[in-house]
UniProtKB/Swiss-Prot annotation:
This is Holliday junction branch migration complex subunit RuvA. Signal peptide: none annotated. The gene is ruvA. Keywords: Cytoplasm, DNA damage, DNA recombination, DNA repair, DNA-binding. Has three domains with a flexible linker between the domains II and III and assumes an 'L' shape. Domain III is highly mobile and contacts RuvB. Residues 152-200 are annotated as: Domain III. It is found in: Cytoplasm. Residues 65-144 are annotated as: Domain II. The lineage of its organism: Bacteria, Pseudomonadati, Verrucomicrobiota, Opitutia, Opitutales. It comes from Opitutus terrae (strain DSM 11246 / JCM 15787 / PB90-1).
């Protein structure tokens, strides 16, 4: 099993990173919370990974810390109805400490705010994970150097909308949420800040 990948960051979006190792470029699916901590393109990077094997595909998921990777695995293995896409959506909305706290406290309302997560799924997260949270540890920062800011303007708006659609939003709803976020944050807002504001 591939438990980590270390190489050069070729490019990144809020939900995906391309890491080059020994001449090979690996596509790694990541949550927004990991994307925020990536270094600039061209820098060395290490992601803690989990490979999901399907009959017709192999998908690599990466995280800033082993704790985040382990929690992702915990969700997809122990919570009924939660697959990789939904788990990534949850971890994009809530950082690990907040996620663990919500589960421990039975905060169904906060969990249900995650895109694509209804009240019943939020309740299952609490019931099935409450006794398991807290064992995954802290989530330290990942970047080996300061992250490069995403380009402001139309490109950031477009990338933020695409990320929300990938998280389960309808296209029109995603565009409206990003538009409101842009009005609140200003024209210089980065893709990551637009996504966080739209999800809040």
């Amino acid at each position: 099993m591939i438990t980590s990948i270390q190489g050069t960051l070729v490019s990144a979006t809020p939900l995906q990173a391309i890491v080059e190792v020994a001449g090979f470029g690996y596509e790694v699916h990541i949550p927004v919370t990991t994307a925020e901590r990536l270094p600039a393109a061209g820098a060395a990077v290490k992601l803690h990974t989990l490979v999901i094997y399907r009959e017709d595909s192999q998908t690599l998921y990466g995280f800033a810390s082993p704790a985040e990777r382990d929690f992702f695995r915990l969700m997809i293995e122990h919570v009924t109805g939660v697959g990789p896409k939904m788990a990534l959506s949850i971890m994009s909305r809530l950082a690990l400490p907040s996620l663990e706290s919500a589960i421990r406290m039975g905060d169904v309302a906060s969990l249900a705010k995650c895109p694509g997560i209804g009240k019943k799924t939020a309740e299952r997260l609490v019931v099935e994970l409450r006794t398991k949270v807290g064992a995954t540890g802290a989530a330290p920062g990942l970047a080996t150097q300061p992250a490069a800011a995403a380009s402001p303007g139309a490109s950031a708006h477009r990338d933020a909308v695409a990320a929300l659609v990938a998280l389960g939003y309808r296209s029109a709803d995603a565009d409206e949420a990003v538009r409101r976020a842009s009005l609140a944050l200003g024209e210089a807002a980065t893709t990551e800040s637009l996504i966080k504001k739209a999800l809040s």
